[in-house]
Amino acid sequence: MSESRRLAIFDYGAGNLHSLVKAISADDRDISIETDLRVATKADVLVLPGVGAFGAAANAMRGAQADLSSALADGLPCLGICLGMQLLFEASEEAPGKGIGFIPGSVARLRTSKVPHMGWNSIEWRESANGNGNPELRTAYFANAYVCQTEDDSPVLAWTTHQDAKFASVVRSANTIGVQFHPEKSSFGGRDFVNAVIEDLITCR
């Protein structure tokens, strides 16, 4: 029997995480929901979920951002989903408060006539994205009014276009992956994707 892997979902205190837990559940995974970020970083994989607002989440992490950034730099595997991806950056126009700052850049509001960006949209992968847990996911479900702006394109694995705004929809730095969409709401393809990403991250530990 294979060793059980510990996955910790950090709960910002913003809402129901049931659909995410269901999407990533497996017999060889021990999934916990943690409200203490320092406890969450002891898991094999840390998951930053997509439920909540930047300001409240930054406040929930207050005092632990530096510890988390250090843990990520030391190789802690991490998956950030929607808001969780945005928290990997330094700051957001949405609210005051510091992000983790692991990926250089910031978060800005979409400058389009239709905000928020809701529903299914395409994902445009760069060729070098192969081997990053990508099982050819081409469309996914989005629900975002803010997007991540990297200092350069090196962390970006995929882009998505909403009206005339093209933004990073998948980023990776070391063992940390962020996705702007909600894989747990993206049907079977999304669930296959998020589980492939987690398996990829587990091998990095």
Which residues does each PLM region occupy?
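Short, surface-exposed beta-strand/loop micro-motifs that present aromatic residues
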Residues: A165-R172
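Cysteine-nucleophile active-site neighborhood
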Residues: G52-N121
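Short acidic low-complexity segments
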Residues: I31-K42
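Pocket-forming structural segment of enzyme catalytic cores
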Residues: E90-D164
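Beta-strand-turn-beta hairpins that frame and shape the catalytic cleft
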Residues: L137, R172-I177
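Short, Asp-centered acidic motifs that coordinate Mg2+ and/or phosphate
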Residues: V45
